[in-house]
């Protein structure tokens, strides 16, 4: 019913709805109120500022750092590395994996093209192969039917 209302009535209804929800008055918005400062924490309870930012890489992360070419051996990798270094190594390995998959896909397509051309030169096709297979199935079914008929006569 409300979707059928158009024109100035809908605009007026929206205006009234906003006013009732308190959106029209700027005094009640409370968007720019600064938080009240409470008692400040003592310096002993704050965390020390000398902690090294970083990440302790797992064995898998170390392998990715090596595969990406960042380090040559596992012994060269420091105990803590930055998140950016791990992320860059993951991205580089991801891109290498994509390139490898693209290359394998192109190689597989070329192999299929070559095998298809060889099959055409041998006069092979999927239709002929399927027809031969179905003919063999029919022969097997006919043979089983005859064997069942002979067994029934023998009894």
UniProtKB/Swiss-Prot annotation:
Keywords: Membrane, Transmembrane, Transmembrane helix. It is found in: Membrane. Its main location: membrane. The keyword Magnesium does not apply. One of its GO terms (cellular component) is mitochondrion. It is a single-pass membrane protein. It holds the Pfam family DUF1075. The chain crosses the membrane at residues 95-114. It comes from the Eukaryota. GO terms for biological process: cellular response to hypoxia; neuron apoptotic process; positive regulation of release of cytochrome c from mitochondria. The keyword Isomerase does not apply. Belongs to the UPF0389 family. This is Protein FAM162B. It comes from Danio rerio. The lineage of its organism: Eukaryota, Metazoa, Chordata, Craniata, Vertebrata.
């Amino acid at each position: 019913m409300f979707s059928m209302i158009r024109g100035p009535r809908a605009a007026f209804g929206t205006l009234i709805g906003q006013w009732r929800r308190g959106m029209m008055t700027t005094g009640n918005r409370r968007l720019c109120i600064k938080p009240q400062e409470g008692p400040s924490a003592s310096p002993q309870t704050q965390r020390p500022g000398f902690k090294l930012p970083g990440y302790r890489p797992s064995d898998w992360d170390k392998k990715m750092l090596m595969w990406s070419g960042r380090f040559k051996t596992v012994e060269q990798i420091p105990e803590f590395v930055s998140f950016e270094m791990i992320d860059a190594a993951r991205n580089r390995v991801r891109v290498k994996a994509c390139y490898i998959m693209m290359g394998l896909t192109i190689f597989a397509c070329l192999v299929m093209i070559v095998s298809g051309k060889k099959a055409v030169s041998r006069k092979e096709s999927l239709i002929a192969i399927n027809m031969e297979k179905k003919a063999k199935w029919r022969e097997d079914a006919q043979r089983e039917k005859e064997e069942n008929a002979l067994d029934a006569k023998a009894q």
